[in-house]
Amino acid sequence: MKRLVVIDGKSVFYRGYYAMPGLSMADGTPTGGVYGFVSLAIELIKKLEPDYVAVAWDKRGTNIRKRRELYPEYKAGRKPAPDDFYQQIPILHELLDAFGWPLYEIDDYEADDIMGAFARQAESRGIETCLITSDLDALQLISPMTKVYAMKNGLRNIEEFTAEYFEQKYGIRTEQFLDLKALKGDSSDNLPGVPGIGEKTAVKLLQEYETLDGVYEHLDEQKGALRTKLENGRESAYLTKQVAEIWTDAPIELDWDVADVNDCDFARVTEILQKLEFNSLIGRLPKTMQMAENEKKEEPKLNIPRIEKLPDMPMFEAENIIYIDSSEPDVIYISSNSESAWTAKIDEISQSMWQLLAQGIVIAADVKQLYHALDNHGVAVRFHEVWDVEQAAFLIDPLKRDRSLNALSGDFSDDNSAPYQLVRLHKIYREQKVYMSNNSQIARVAYEFDFPVIWALFQMEKRGMKLDDTLLKQMGDELAAEVSRLEQQMYSMAGYEFNASSPAQLSEVLFTKLQLPTAGIKKGKTGYSTGQKELDKLRGQHPIIELIERYRELTKLISTYIEALPKLMATDGRIHTTFNQDVTSTGRLSSTNPNLQNIPVRTELGRKIRQAFVPSDGKVFVGADYSQFELRLAAVLAGDEKLIEDFNSDVDIHAKTAAETYGISIDEVSKSQRRAAKVINFGVLYGMSPHGLAAATGMSFTEAKKFIDHYFEVRKPIRQYLDKILTQAREQGFVETYFGRRRPTPDVKSSNFMVRSSAERAAMNMPIQGTEADLMKLAMIRLEDKLSGLADAILQVHDSILVECKPEDVQKVSEIMKAEMEGVCPELPIKLKVDVGTGANWGEV
């Protein structure tokens, strides 16, 4: 049996819009609704495998005109969608046209009516229909030949309705659905039904009397309030039924030839998806789209390179692409042009040949991974110059999610064998070189920071950090005992045992058993929230709150670190984390498997966990940490000459800020005043509000607001700088670091307040954090060479670098680290300060 799929266009688009808030192209064009629609539609088309596809659309302004003649209050009170909702509709329509999915809209009829008309037309032809919608009105269209796929919430929760499933769920037949709606009404459409009658009562009435007419024919059998409601609501019930009924006789005909699923223009679809930066969706397109007849004839032929065995004495070019296929980890491919490539077993290539190859530029998708792959085969080589394709892609567009070779090259064929990947690498490299030649600042960041630091990152990953798992186990036993004590104390307070890790059970204990106040506490489907923000509001109300917070702190540390870290130990007894350059859009390094950067440093327990990380036998740790790094860089970027002078004169910046803000001398500054100044000095860089300052210092909101106002009077260049950054973000669509690393800022124009506010904070933060990241990478590059043979860098966390060395070399290593890190960038007008410490474990440093 052939199958027709009809999509309720605006309904599905609406769900996509709110499921993907803030999604946009690099130039700021919003695309969340389009992405959500296409993503869902693709998956459903793959699942349902239709022969025909059509889209029903609500014509703006005129689609409900006829129903409003019947009931002027129909759909009254609905808020208009944001501007960027309508801004995306032409984009979606263009894409639907490329898909070959005809769009139908008509005056005076809604999308439901169009769907109903098409379903009946299909039924008369013996064609099955699947209706895709989030509007449950469509359930009245269910028949042996028509199914409804209803989106419940988001994009993934879809309910398939057949006649059998409908009856099982509602307890009535599909032909009774319209009468159900007539009785209970529909608040979303502003249809009253019978006021006071809900779904349960309506279902019960229909189970007994079959129809709305049957209910009123037996009205004398009802008593009391129910009878009164039915009597008073008779007119509104029948009006609701009339308005809610889907008009399947809508004057519109489906063109079956146009709706044929094989009418897709795949080349145009690919072009549009690439323009929208939806590269990941291209590979997900159904085969029926990719192999449409008009595309089979024009399928492009790739110029696949000729693969030859690597000769004994190869003449390498100045630029060579190296590729290792994960399915053949012991085989390497080397290509200097797109026409040919050499291949060989890694173990068969001599060290002298590697050294010869290393003299030129080595291009790879992931250079760090290439180093690891070669190291696994005992190859010790450092390339003179590298080009990391994925890192270059990140520099060019840090918001781009898909940086696979398929996405970067625009080639989404299924063949990912080595020859095809080499073709893609050549194409991407050529395009990236052109981009870099036209964007000197981005090129500088690549050549001076991101590419050279890859060697240092590889070395740190290879070295790893030694873990004292015995100490960790001992700590785990102690914490487990404390957790048990906390549980017993909480059980005693509650009067019974419960699962303290269950939000639902905890909510029951706090708000039902202990009767804690619920004013201002968020409430969800499972009860009142027990999140940290809500617990903060309850602090002091009952001693169990402090126990819960301690319990959560301990159980998180146990599961995240104490139990997890030993499982991640390699056979050498060390933890080998992975350092990523292309995760945070500021350019900061991140750490995964495990994330060593997130181990708490300011808590006693966090420091204890750090004590389990120890140096290699016979060595000690030396750590160097930039002091007030971000604030110094803020002074530079803002051009705050006064603040720069204070830093260069080693003035206590926080005390000076407090003195100037409060209008007193430095000698008169109290500890609390200095603390407030310290909080705002750093917090202002992240857009701290009066509420945030009040929460961090204990000030009242009024005091905090006054303090911030005075602060910006003293630090006018900082205020002007932050304002300038936001203006640049809005007008130019990006912000950048001191050295030219860029971050696109499309969301600063979002109509969603939360999305826009978050984007503004990120925009203010990025130039400072990004400059910090650039300088840290430069310091790592310098130290990797300066400390060679003397100390090994093993970890980088935000503003600090950790190395291990012999005890007798500590002083020399410390001096080198301090000198190199403080002098990392002589062009800066400010003096950088580095504190150096040493210890027998990470916690001591």
What is the predicted role of each segment?
Residues 4-5, 9, 15-54, 68, ...:
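Conserved RNase H-like, two-metal-ion catalytic cores of nucleic-acid enzymes
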